[in-house]
């Protein structure tokens, strides 16, 4: 007599879910690759909360506290003394060689552009690239490229005007956060339309899809236990317990 096992239906459903997730992940990865090829660089889009919108300019790894980056008077005098020592002990060629060595170790600049609607565009540049490349990228991804805009850093608020400067000279290496501003009109209700176009905003959902398949795959193989082995293991443990001598027994 055939008995319908509900566990088989559960297993089939899991396999279908895994297949669908893998197909969605593969499609999302393909779209992300197409966007990377279209824009000529690796980009990410994510949404940040208003609490995390603290004006700062940091590297791509935000692990240190604010006190770590505070410039104290002691740091100033130490830096001044170091500069005087460098001028007296090092020739111009030596300083240039050291600067070139430091620069050669830095291979990328991770720039995050934060928009007023809490969306952040992250793009990777080479330190020797010009800031004009960032301006051109923003023009391609905003929803209204015809509306004039500008980028600025803070604090203090300083508009970026020299687009011919490279990221290294601007101090944007290994990473920096810049802010976007324009004269985009707001609705009567006070809400504004998205600053990024729909195509680039879709990257936020696509990246989530590529990560969503990972926990599903981890549960794709249900744990199977050989029922015949359970009593044997239990019996072996019981035997071991019986053969063990009590602590109080002495020969």
From Swiss-Prot:
It is found in: Cytoplasm. GO terms for molecular function: ATPase binding. GO terms for biological process: organ growth; protein-containing complex disassembly. It comes from the Eukaryota. Its main location: cytoplasm. Residues 212-251 are annotated as: Disordered. Residues 217-227 have a biased composition (Polar residues). CDD domains: UBX2_UBXN9. One of its GO terms (cellular component) is cytoplasm. Gene3D superfamilies: Phosphatidylinositol 3-kinase Catalytic Subunit, Chain A, domain 1 (3.10.20.90). Regulates CDC48A by inhibiting its ATPase activity and by promoting the disassembly of the active hexamer. This is Plant UBX domain-containing protein 1. It comes from Arabidopsis thaliana (Mouse-ear cress).
């Amino acid at each position: 007599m055939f008995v319908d096992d509900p566990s088989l239906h559960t297993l089939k459903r899991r396999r279908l879910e895994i297949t669908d997730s893998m197909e969605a992940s593969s499609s999302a990865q393909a779209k992300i690759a197409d966007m990377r090829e279209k824009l000529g660089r690796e980009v990410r889009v994510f949404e940040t909360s208003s609490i995390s919108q603290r004006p700062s300019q940091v590297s791509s790894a935000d692990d240190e506290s604010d006190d770590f980056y505070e410039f104290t008077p002691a740091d100033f005098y130490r830096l001044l003394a170091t500069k005087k020592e460098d001028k007296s002990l090092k020739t111009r060629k030596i300083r240039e060689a050291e600067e070139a060595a430091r620069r050669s170790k830095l291979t990328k600049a991770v720039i995050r552009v934060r928009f007023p609607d809490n969306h952040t565009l992250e793009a990777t540049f080479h330190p020797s690239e010009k800031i004009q490349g960032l301006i051109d990228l923003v023009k391609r991804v905003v929803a209204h490229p015809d509306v004039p805009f500008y980028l600025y850093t803070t604090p203090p608020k300083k508009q970026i005007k020299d687009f011919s400067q490279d990221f290294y000279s601007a101090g944007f290496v290994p990473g920096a956060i810049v802010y976007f501003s324009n004269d985009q009109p707001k609705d009567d209700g006070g809400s504004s339309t998205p600053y990024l176009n729909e195509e680039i905003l879709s990257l936020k959902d696509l990246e989530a899809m590529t990560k969503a398949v990972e926990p599903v795959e981890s549960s794709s193989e249900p744990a199977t236990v050989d029922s015949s082995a359970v009593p044997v293991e239990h019996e072996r443990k019981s035997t071991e317990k019986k053969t063990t001598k009590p602590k109080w027994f002495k020969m």
